[in-house]
């Protein structure tokens, strides 16, 4: 019985070993044929992927056409608005302030009454001077009559020559006194006139510096009120010294250089004026020169000490080739654009740029009017690649929001 069991275990072990050997031999014999099949399948998949890339959708881009325009050249600088004239109104006589005839902040004209000093003392002084003048005029008239009689009597030797000369001297002396009296009358009249304080220039009055009832003096430095002349008004801005020659040449050519004032953010045009003058020296610390422009400012858009951005038109480039600023790229070789041919294949082209702003760039060399350039999707481009030109998508917000420089033509230098 025991021998029978041992025999059965031996047979079972032999079957297992034979099965394992058969499996090992079979797997080794199939491996050389299976590997080429897997490799072929991988190559087929890769080839299919490459065919899918070639036959897939083209890279979408947006494009614009180079056009010719008349492009103005601007010189830009930072500036401050200043009053054409600033006058501190002071009293020229001493006395009590009895009235103010202006509202703070109002516009006044030259000659308008601003304040009144008590005129009583000046009227009294004028009356005294006029009385003295009248008295001396009477004295002169009497002295002249006596002189006429002395001259008649001297002919008959009834009066001496000495008496005649004395009477003539009296007349001359009285005439001198009358001239002094007339000057006193004029001075008293002037003092009375000065008690009425009028505006020396047209402009906007500021806040009052003194209240009615105060005793004021001609030596008061604060004055009564300050007037700033804002019609017209000036703008002082700076330009680099390298721009001086351009401005001087334009002036010598007889051009009236237009200056625009833009707000602090450089997004809204405030007013337009003309160049008035250049300073006579360059600031050595900054290498800039001061420029003064004048504006009529009838709409009061400019105020003294207001900070603005100034742009001065110095020239206009006719028939300039212009493309959107987004089309111009910068690389190691310099500025370039991606140009589209008739089959929508792109190629890189070096260009030389001129006048530019945040929207447009003048191409001074490298492009012609009518050339199409890529403005969006540039990062997906390679030399010779074919692309799909799509129209830009406009959102409702874009349709409702005007351009920051709507109505602005040309570019800034």
From Swiss-Prot:
Q: Which GO terms describe its molecular function?
A: efflux transmembrane transporter activity
User: Which source organism?
Assistant: Salmonella typhi
Signal peptide positions are: 1-20
Q: Region Disordered: list its residue ranges.
A: 31-57, 391-413
Question: Which stretches does UniProt call biased (Low complexity)?
Answer: 32-49
Instruction: Describe the subunit structure.
Output: Part of a tripartite efflux system composed of MdtA, MdtB and MdtC.
> What is this protein identified as?
Multidrug resistance protein MdtA
Regions annotated as coiled coil: none
How does the protein's chain sit in the membrane according to the entry? Peripheral membrane protein
Where is it mainly found?
Answer: membrane
């Amino acid at each position: 019985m025991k021998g029978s069991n041992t025999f059965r275990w031996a047979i079972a072990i032999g079957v297992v070993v034979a099965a394992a050997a058969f499996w090992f031999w079979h797997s080794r014999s199939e491996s050389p044929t299976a590997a080429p099949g897997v490799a072929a399948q991988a190559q087929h998949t890769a080839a299919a992927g490459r065919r899918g890339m070639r036959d897939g959708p083209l890279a979408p881009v947006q494009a614009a056409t180079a056009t010719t325009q008349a492009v103005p050249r601007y010189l830009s600088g930072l500036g401050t608005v200043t009053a054409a004239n600033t006058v501190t109104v002071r009293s020229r006589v001493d006395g009590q302030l009895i009235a103010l005839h202006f509202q703070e902040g109002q516009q006044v004209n030259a000659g308008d009454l601003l304040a009144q000093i008590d005129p009583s003392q000046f009227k009294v002084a004028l009356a005294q001077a006029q009385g003295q003048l009248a008295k001396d005029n009477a004295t002169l008239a009497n002295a002249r009559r006596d002189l006429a009689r002395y001259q008649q009597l001297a002919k008959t030797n009834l009066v001496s020559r000495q008496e005649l000369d004395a009477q003539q001297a009296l007349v001359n002396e009285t005439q001198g006194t009358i001239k002094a009296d007339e000057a006193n009358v004029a001075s008293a009249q002037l003092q009375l006139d000065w008690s009425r304080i009028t505006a020396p220039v047209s402009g906007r009055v500021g806040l009052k510096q003194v209240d009615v009832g105060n005793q004021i003096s001609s030596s008061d430095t604060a004055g009564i009120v300050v007037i700033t002349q804002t019609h017209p008004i000036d703008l002082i801005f700076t330009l680099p010294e390298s721009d001086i020659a351009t401005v001087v040449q334009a002036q010598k050519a007889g051009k009236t250089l237009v200056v625009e004032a833009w707000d602090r953010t450089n997004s809204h045009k405030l007013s337009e004026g003309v160049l008035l003058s250049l300073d006579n020296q360059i600031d050595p610390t900054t290498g800039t020169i001061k420029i003064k422009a004048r504006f009529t400012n009838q709409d009061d858009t400019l105020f003294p000490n207001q900070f603005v951005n100034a742009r001065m038109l110095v020239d206009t480039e006719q028939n300039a080739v212009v493309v959107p600023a987004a089309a111009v790229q910068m690389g190691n070789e310099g500025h370039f654009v991606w140009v589209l041919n008739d089959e929508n294949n792109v190629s890189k082209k070096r260009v030389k740029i001129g006048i530019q702003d945040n929207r447009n760039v003048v191409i001074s060399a490298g492009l012609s009017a009518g050339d199409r350039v890529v403005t969006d999707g540039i990062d997906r481009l390679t030399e010779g690649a074919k692309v799909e030109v799509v129209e830009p998508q406009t959102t409702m917000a874009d349709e409702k929001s005007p351009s920051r420089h709507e109505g602005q033509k040309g570019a800034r230098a």
